[in-house]
């Protein structure tokens, strides 16, 4: 007998695949050529904002993939390095992640921008701007991003901010903020949504709306250099599925939220729905992915956080061919 969970997953898959068909006309797959491989491995981490890759399974099957694996990474804080080690073939991650990994020699390629603005900087009452974090206790899901934000407004991140960090699983900056033990917290979904649901703190920077951050992609799609080089048709089809799923996140957030909960990528439907409603998933055609790489690479280089120049990273470790083709195929 088919379990209720399996049946729900199957029906949800049919529903999502049908919805994707309504959002975009089916591509002429024959024009791509034959798939070099029918296997693809997608990274699985705890960030709800990566929903497009979590709900792309049926779309990947429609593209001809028969073995689709979601892989738990050994180090979800270093997705680019994990893909470079061969743990997965594709994943989305905050733009700084692949740039750092490329600078360190990871054999990966940045392929597309996916969405804007998932991080929010939340502060205790009385703190209204980043400059007021001087001398304050701060924790961050991405310390590097907060370093760039602080430097952007003239703070010395190393000396002006009291960083609160932890390396074991018991470290929970959200609860530290809730208990008033830190003054600010830079978080990615579902943490900002959880704080909002608990009526804690106030947002002083939202990457979705505040410049300059809102003018660039937050998360970008990367792939294994070996996979992209050896399987160009499979790469394009995998990207097509993920970008179609990105459109679904923008057009049908409630459906996508239910799907990622049913498939146990996250537990809270409310947080998932709030994340999908907050994050702009409708910018992948409009924004320039190369501009995002240049923006973050320049700031990392100026802060002596990477050695490679933006020009070197863009020239050697980005590939926009597939994205440009898909922008023409999947017109809004």
Where are these regions (language model features)?
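Pocket-lining segment of extracytoplasmic ligand-binding domains
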Residues: 96, 171-262
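Short, polar/charged alpha-helical segment
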Residues: 46-73, 77-78, 82-84, 99-104, ...
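Conserved C-terminal helix/tail region of periplasmic/extracytoplasmic solute-binding proteins
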Residues: 301-332
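N-terminal secretory signal peptides and thylakoid transit peptides that target proteins
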Residues: 2-18
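Short beta-strand-to-loop elements that line the ligand-binding cleft
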Residues: 67-75, 92, 157-169
């Amino acid at each position: 007998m088919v379990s209720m969970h399996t049946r729900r997953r199957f029906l949800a898959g049919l529903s999502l695949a049908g919805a994707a068909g309504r959002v975009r006309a089916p591509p002429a797959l024959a024009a791509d050529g034959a798939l070099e491989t029918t296997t693809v491995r997608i990274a699985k981490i705890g960030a709800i904002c990566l929903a497009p890759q979590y709900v792309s399974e049926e779309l990947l099957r429609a593209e001809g993939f028969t073995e689709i694996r979601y892989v738990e990474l050994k180090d979800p804080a270093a997705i680019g390095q994990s893909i470079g080690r061969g743990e997965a073939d594709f994943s989305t991650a905050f733009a700084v992640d692949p740039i750092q990994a490329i600078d360190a020699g990871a054999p990966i390629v940045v392929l597309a921008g996916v969405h804007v603005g998932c991080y929010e900087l939340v502060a205790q009452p009385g703190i209204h701007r980043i400059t007021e974090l001087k001398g304050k206790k701060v924790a961050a899901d991405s310390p590097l991003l907060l370093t760039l934000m602080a430097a952007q407004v003239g703070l010395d991140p190393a000396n002006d901010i009291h960083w609160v960090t932890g390396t074991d699983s018991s470290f929970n900056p959200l609860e530290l903020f809730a208990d008033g033990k830190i003054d600010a917290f830079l978080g990615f979904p579902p943490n900002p949504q959880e704080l909002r649901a608990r009526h804690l703190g106030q947002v002083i920077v939202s990457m979705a709306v505040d410049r300059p951050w809102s003018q660039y992609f937050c998360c970008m799609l990367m792939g294994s250099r070996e996979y992209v080089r050896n399987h160009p048709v499979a790469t394009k089809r995998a990207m097509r599925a993920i970008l179609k799923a990105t459109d679904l996140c923008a057009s049908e957030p409630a459906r996508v939220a239910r799907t990622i909960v049913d498939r146990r990528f996250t537990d809270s439907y409310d947080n998932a729905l709030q994340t999908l409603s907050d994050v702009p998933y409708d910018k992948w055609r409009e924004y320039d992915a190369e501009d995002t790489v240049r923006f973050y690479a320049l700031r990392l280089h100026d802060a002596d956080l990477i050695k490679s120049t933006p020009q070197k990273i863009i020239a050697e470790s980005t590939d926009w061919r597939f994205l440009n083709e898909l922008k023409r195929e999947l017109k809004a």
